[in-house]
UniProtKB/Swiss-Prot annotation:
Gene Ontology BP terms: regulation of cell cycle
One function term, GO molecular function aspect: cyclin-dependent protein serine/threonine kinase inhibitor activity
Family: Belongs to the CDI family. ICK/KRP subfamily.
Gene (name only): KRP1
Domain of life, per lineage: Eukaryota
Name of the protein described by the UniProt record: Cyclin-dependent kinase inhibitor 1
């Protein structure tokens, strides 16, 4: 930038005051100003056109034309674009056969499941019955083996008891609910048949009990301790605590004390 002073002289020779001219870098000329104004006008027109189109799009669109396809779908020709419309949903009546078919298939599956469960239950019951028969047979064999150890004097009674027990322990003679009673009876018999403690067991129990020495032994022990303590006191203080009299030889001289009452 620079400042220039220009002076002009008039025809009469008068000196006119010059005006200060300030030149700024980047000052637009007339042509540049006209071009900038034209560009601004173009931008304003484009913005107004875009806003007009936006307002038209926001307004309720009017259908210009429709084109329907075979599948039920159609295109709506709007003012600015073409809109696709999906076909309408089928009526609920068309779904009823499908639902009925699904229900029928579900019932069939439930029936198959029930049949499978019945087969499984029957198989399980047969397996349980077989296992119960085997367990009862084993119990009867054990009972027979236990009854063989009975003395000869009671052979007739044990034979009748074995026959009765064999008849009672057959699988077909009682219901499954009676098995628990039989087991409880066998357990009670085993508890009752436990042997009594022997003499060796009793002696071992006696040996483990704490021993209390007799009164005479306790008295002798304390008497010896008292005698030793009396000897130690007599040797140190020349006084016999057992008889209550002083000794002649010693470091101390004992003098009897007379009470004031006497």
């Amino acid at each position: 930038m620079g400042k220039y002073m220009r002076k002009f002289r008039g025809a009469t020779g008068e000196e006119l005051a010059a005006m200060e001219v300030t030149q700024v870098v980047g000052v637009r000329t007339r042509s540049r100003s006209a071009a900038a104004a034209g560009a601004t006008t173009t931008k304003v027109q484009a913005a107004s056109a875009a806003s007009t189109r936006r307002r038209k799009a926001l307004l309720p669109t009017a259908v210009v034309g429709t084109t329907r396809r075979d599948g039920g779908s159609c295109y709506l020709q709007l003012r600015s674009r073409m809109l696709f419309m999906a076909p309408p949903r089928p009526a609920p009546a068309a779904r009823a056969p499908v639902v009925a078919e699904a229900a029928g298939s579900g019932n069939g599956a439930a029936a198959h499941a029930a049949a499978g469960l019945s087969r499984c239950s029957s198989t399980a019951s047969s397996v349980d019955a077989a296992a119960q028969d085997r367990s009862l047979a084993c119990r009867s064999d054990v009972a027979e083996a236990g009854s063989e150890h009975v003395p000869e004097g009671s052979a007739s009674d044990s034979a009748s008891g074995r026959d009765r027990e064999r008849r009672e322990t057959t699988p077909s003679s009682f219901l499954p609910g009676e098995v628990s009673d039989l087991e409880s009876d066998l357990a009670g018999g085993q508890k009752r048949s436990r042997p009594l403690p022997s003499a060796a067991t009793a002696s071992a129990q006696q040996a483990t009990r704490p021993k209390i020495p007799p009164a005479a032994e306790i008295e002798a022990f304390f008497a010896a301790a008292e005698e030793a303590e009396a000897k130690r006191f007599a040797a140190k203080y020349n006084f016999d605590v057992v008889r209550g009299v002083p000794l002649d030889a010693g470091r101390f001289e004992w003098t009897p004390v007379v009470s004031s009452r006497s």
